[in-house]
Amino acid sequence: MRTVVPFDPRDPKSRLAEFFADAEERRGFAYAMLADVLGAVRDAGGDPVVVATAPVSRPVDAPVTVDDRALSTAVAAAIADGPLPTAVVMADLALATPDAIRRVFAASGDVVLAPGSGGGTNVVLARTADVPVSYHGVSFRDHVTAAERAGLTVTTVDSFRLAADVDDASDLVDVFVHNTRRTREWLIAGGWRLAVDDGTPTVVREPND
C-alpha cells in the first residue's frame, strides 16, 4: 500500500531545542525516527513515499517529493493525486511497529484513523480521494466529524505504538523502553541513557570526558 510519510527537514523538533545541543542534532534525531518509520512501513507491506517540506540533506530509503505547502494541504494533495488506498503515517512515530501498521492496513472503512495521545491524528488511511484532512487543533475529532459529514465510514485503530509521537523530552523515555531500531541506537551513540531519579524515569546525557 502506498504510504505517505510527511517530513520537515528544515527545523525539526523545535520543542526539543533545550534537550539537544543544536538544530543539527535535532535534525539527526528526526532523520533517525524517519528511518524507523520507513522501515516499519516497509516491513508491514507498505510502499513508503516521503513528502518533505524541503530537499532532504541526508540519505533517505524511499522516494522523496518536495511540497512546501502546509501539512494539511500537502497531505490532501498526496491522497488526491496518488493511487488508492493511500495511508499517511507521521515521521515521528518512533515506537511504530510493522504489526501496528498492519492493523491499520487491514482495517475496514472508507477512512481509518489512528489517534495521537494529545488529540492529534498520527495515521490516516484513505480509500477514497475526497477524505477531508486537517491537522490543526484536535485533529482526530475533526477528522471523524468531517468524514462522517461527508458520508464516509470511519474506523479507529487504538494503538499505543501509533499514538506515541515524540514531541518533548518526556517522550524519550518511551523511546528507550520500546524502540528497538535506529532511534534508540542514535540516542545511545550520542551519549544519552535512561536513568531513574527518585523513582521517576528520565533520559540524561553522559558528560564528555
Curated annotation (Swiss-Prot):
- Originating gene: cofC
Q: What pathway or pathways are given for this protein in its record?
A: Cofactor biosynthesis; coenzyme F420 biosynthesis
Question: Can you say what this protein is called?
Answer: 2-phospho-L-lactate guanylyltransferase
Arranged from A to Z, the UniProt key words for this protein are: GTP-binding, Nucleotide-binding, Nucleotidyltransferase, Transferase
By its UniProt entry, which SUPFAM superfamilies does this protein fall under? Nucleotide-diphospho-sugar transferases
Enzyme class (EC, first level): transferase
Q: What does this protein do?
A: Guanylyltransferase that catalyzes the activation of (2S)-2-phospholactate (2-PL) as (2S)-lactyl-2-diphospho-5'-guanosine, via the condensation of 2-PL with GTP. It is involved in the biosynthesis of coenzyme F420, a hydride carrier cofactor.
tRNA processing as a keyword of this entry, yes or no, is no
Q: Which Pfam families match?
A: CofC (PF01983)
Stored NCBIfam families: F420_cofC (TIGR03552)
Would the keyword Phosphoprotein turn up in this protein's UniProt record?
no
Q: Which family does it belong to?
A: Belongs to the CofC family.
Q: Which GO terms describe its biological process?
A: F420-0 metabolic process
E.C. number, please? 2.7.7.68
Report TM segments.
none
Instruction: Identify the Gene3D superfamilies for this entry.
Output: 6.10.140.50, Spore Coat Polysaccharide Biosynthesis Protein SpsA, Chain A
Quaternary structure (record): Homodimer.
- Superkingdom per UniProt: Archaea
Annotated Gene Ontology MF terms?
GTP binding; phospholactate guanylyltransferase activity
Q: Which InterPro entries match?
A: CofC (IPR002835), Nucleotide-diphossugar_trans (IPR029044)
